[in-house]
Amino acid sequence: MSKPLVSIVMGSDSDLDIMREAAKALEGFGIAYEIDVTSAHRSPDRTADYARKAASRGVRVIIAGAGGAAHLAGVIAAHTTLPVIGVPIPSTSLNGLDSLLATVQMPAGIPVATVAIGKPGATNAGILAAQMLGLSSAPLAKKLEEHKETLANGVEEKSKKLRITLGT
């Protein structure tokens, strides 16, 4: 198995159902990844160590998902120069809005690229990581272009079906 280029990390194993969507997106592009659990609050030393050592494992992008206080992506970004993508996880309160705000509101100098809340966000995090890696990989860039074409073709098909259904 090849070294992981992307690290998917989550604050709790209860986030796995959502973060699997990032893994599926990466698998669709043939990108190797690792997946783990670490907590910004319950295991801060482990989280900092994980972030510091990611590049030495061959990781080039980190995707971090967390709910509630959702400081995981920010703590990781504070301990690495690798790009960090934050996925806000919906929590029992505020439907994930709290997670979104905690993930997106980073101080200047510690960027976290934040995507949408939940499964759509996790999918987009995987695709965004692929786009970052595609900047230095022509074969991956081609796969990304093909992905966009597939999406566009799907819309075209839906448009045709709708026009037929409506008789226009």
Language-model-detected regions and their locations in the chain:
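Short glycine/serine/threonine-rich phosphate/pyrophosphate-binding segments
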Residues: D15-M19, S43-T47, A66-V75, L94-L97, ...
